[in-house]
Amino acid sequence: PLLIHGGGLGIKEKLDELNIESKFIMGLRVTDEKMIKIVEDVMVEFNKKIIKALEKKSCKAKSITIKENNIIHVEQESKELGYVGKPIKVNTNLLNDIIQKDFIPIITPMGLDQKGQSYNINADTAAGAIARSLRSRRLLLVTDVDGVLDKNEKLVSEIRSYEAEKLIDNQTIHGGMIPKIKTCIEAVNNGVRGVVII
């Protein structure tokens, strides 16, 4: 197993503390030059907390951040999103090496471009890219929402890719669920046998 964590709540708290307003486009946080450093600091700190918590439970965990063992190479998602990256390559050799040594990789959803510039990556997008690259059997997305809701706001317990795409097109799926569901679709269309949102 491996764990890719987000940092949305911690990032929001830090930005609020500094009176910096967040903007979102299609569920993705617009990240400017000032914000990327804050995002990185919050992610690294949260990563350390997860490692400590796991070690207290006698679990061997290895930190994966852009400072230590960067595994995600990115390109800019779009100019309007700023320092938001789209994964283009995952270093699976490093991940497999860590896993074979019986460590659980704890991964921050950030990556570096060819010039070494750091980029924020939506955690679900990063998880999907890693799952596809490793040809994982399952991708579990843990979230604070119930899951996919239909137009009557009833929970959809199972959905096919084409049905999910229709729900995005007609805006039944919106906001932060868009990148989550797009990740699910890309994962199952690229070799991951199943995706579960819990």
Which residues fall in each region the model found?
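Nucleotide/pyrophosphate-binding catalytic subdomain
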Residues: P1-I197
